[in-house]
Amino acid sequence: VHQDMVGDDNAAFERAVDAALAAGARVLVSTGAVSQGRYDFIPAALRARGAQVLFHKVAIRPGKPLLFARLAGGALFFGLPGNPVSAAVGQRFFVEPLLRRQLGMADEQPLWLPLHSEMRKPLGLRMHARARILLDAGGHLSAQVLPGQESFRLKTTVQANAWVVVDEQ
């Protein structure tokens, strides 16, 4: 595992990518600089390196600006959003499944549970909600979506012991 930290600096990013590839990395993961802001230079930097951007932006919340690319030498690159909760969603639902497959591990199997209370979500987006699994007096499990699902709220991430994933519909 090669690890590096760079700021919003294209040249430093290039050096970090080169160092990771020289160390034999087959999957690279970065956080930040993948959206559309002034300092979001990674999509252009990857294209300049000859990378093929396979997707950039996904219909999920949180974590929409996620980027996935194949670098010129074949290594894979995940550009996760800089927001901590959005980055956690990208890691959990995109990076980890790919790594499991590359390691020959079986896909995870979801645990289907009733919701403890009603939940609203935007149409057309897959929602990844921080939740707690509850056990009632009768021995039945349910999933409680925690209040404060905005991606800037970190407290619910600490309180959660599960994710509730609700499809686009």
Residue ranges and their predicted role:
Residues 1-49:
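N-terminal small/polar loop signature for handling phosphorylated ligands or for N-terminal nucleophile
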Residues 45-169:
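Flexible glycine/proline-rich
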